[in-house]
């Protein structure tokens, strides 16, 4: 039986959606990397003198989403101390289990992958390991259940990730600007493929559940920008995959998309620097869903 014949319709849809013939893949200028670096360096260097010499401003997709959505919520979240919980841990552990599935030599069973991922995360020396060590039985069972649901859903709706696709999960990516005073960073949920010369071939995928939000697309544009600066060739496509409904929201990367991401980074960094280092008062947002601003506006 052909490998594809053993796949269910959702798995075949993944192959059809993410695949592309070499002749259909875009190619980019060899100068794109240097042009993006220079443009972003110029735009971010103006903030260097506002950042104290002994501090580094780390900017992730999370920070950009916060500051662009609500400046007051950004400040409130920054002042509160992050704590691990079942909702915050299940995504990371799910990604670890999916990563293990690529190289798993035994029969792939979701719960076996989940338990192995939990064991590996608990054996570290970081805050997550400490939290897992002290977890009560009820919370541990809930965590196993939540992660198992995500991993099982992935294995049902995605074809097995072949090694020749060059899958990478939770791969860190970063770029430094303003003599190291500003660092843009993130972790890609899943990347597949690679560029050939200046021809784009990589696909970046972010896994979500729930509703679509415009910030999901902005997250991936941010990753596409960092990937373009790192390699000199953008990803061919970026896609959010919603596990609970087996659907994609994708975008092909063009220079216009990268330019839009670059402008958003500049805008977000400016807002963050002004609030943290210039003393600018954070603005209220107009969203009726913002607990901070909607309550004060009423």
Question: What are the residue ranges of the model-derived segments?
Answer:
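Anion-coordinating catalytic cores for phosphoryl-, nucleotidyl-, and glycosidic chemistry
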Residues: 41, 64-65, 173-177, 188, ...
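Mg2+/Mn2+-dependent nuclease catalytic core
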Residues: 171-263, 267
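Metal-dependent nuclease catalytic regions and adjoining charged, substrate-binding loops involved
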Residues: 1-8, 16-19, 23-29, 48, ...
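A non-catalytic, helix-rich entry segment at domain boundaries
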Residues: 97-172
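Short, amphipathic alpha-helical segments that act as regulatory/interfacial helices
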Residues: 91, 95-102, 224
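A residue-level signal for conserved active-site and pocket-lining positions in enzyme catalytic cores
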Residues: 70, 94-95, 190, 223, ...
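C-terminal, charged and often intrinsically disordered regions of DNA end-processing helicases
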Residues: 1-90
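Hydrophobic (often cysteine-bearing) scaffold residues that line and stabilize catalytic clefts
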Residues: 86, 90, 94, 143, ...
């Amino acid at each position: 039986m052909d490998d594809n014949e053993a796949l269910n319709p959702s798995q075949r849809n993944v192959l059809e959606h993410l695949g592309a013939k070499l002749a259909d893949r875009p190619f980019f200028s060899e100068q794109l990397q240097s042009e993006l670096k220079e443009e972003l360096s110029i735009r971010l260097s103006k903030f260097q003198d506002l950042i104290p010499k002994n501090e580094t401003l780390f900017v992730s997709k999370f920070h950009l989403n916060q500051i662009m959505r609500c400046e007051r919520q950004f400040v409130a979240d920054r002042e509160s101390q992050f704590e691990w919980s079942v909702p915050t841990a299940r995504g990371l552990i799910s990604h670890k289990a999916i990563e293990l599935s690529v190289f798993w030599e035994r029969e792939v069973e979701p719960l076996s992958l989940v338990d192995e991922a939990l064991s590996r995360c608990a054996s570290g020396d970081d805050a997550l390991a400490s939290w897992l060590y002290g977890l009560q039985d009820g919370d541990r069972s809930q965590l196993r259940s939540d992660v198992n649901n995500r991993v099982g859903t992935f294995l049902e709706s995605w074809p097995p990730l072949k090694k020749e696709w060059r899958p990478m999960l939770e791969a860190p990516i970063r770029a430094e600007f303003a003599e190291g005073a500003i660092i843009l960073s993130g972790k890609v949920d899943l990347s597949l493929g690679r560029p050939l010369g200046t021809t784009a071939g990589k696909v970046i995928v972010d896994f979500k559940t729930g509703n679509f939000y415009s910030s999901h697309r902005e997250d991936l544009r941010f990753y596409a920008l960092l990937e373009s600066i790192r390699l000199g060739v953008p990803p061919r496509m970026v896609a959010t995959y919603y596990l609970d409904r087996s659907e994609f929201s994708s975008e092909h990367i063009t220079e216009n998309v990268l330019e839009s991401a670059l402008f958003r980074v500049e805008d977000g960094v400016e807002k963050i620097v002004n609030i943290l280092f210039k003393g600018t008062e954070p603005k209220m947002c107009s969203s009726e869903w913002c607990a901070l601003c909607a309550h004060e506006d009423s």
